[in-house]
């Protein structure tokens, strides 16, 4: 299983970024600071995706690439307490809990302390 996490600064908004991601051949990609995955579905051809964020151009996308149809994603909670720390159930070839993270300062806490508080 290959998992890639990438803060790609404003999503996969260029063919260069799409190509670089696909060259890594991930089964699952966590894309921080991302456009909504619908915007790049034709370019990376993911099988399914979860996305969190208030803006359509700035969020956290978690995608199963269509090269690997071995995994399914589902949120473990109805409402995420910390917007950028998302617990996900991954099922399929292997079953596990994935905590997708895009750390940001919140309420005066540093990146690390936000993650620590969420966990």
What are these regions (language model features)?
Residues 1-44, 51, 56:
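N-terminal, active-site-proximal structural segment of metallo-dependent hydrolase catalytic domains
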Residues 10-11, 78-79, 112:
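A conditional alpha-helix N-cap/helix-loop micro-motif detector
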Residues 13-15, 108-111:
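Active-site-adjacent loop/helix micro-motif of nuclease/hydrolase catalytic cores
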Residues 22-26, 50, 82-83, 117-119:
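Short, low-complexity, polar/charged sequence segments that are solvent-exposed and flexible
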Residues 34-106:
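Structured beta-strand-rich core segments of catalytic domains in phosphoester-bond hydrolases
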Residues 109-119:
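A long, amphipathic alpha-helix that forms part
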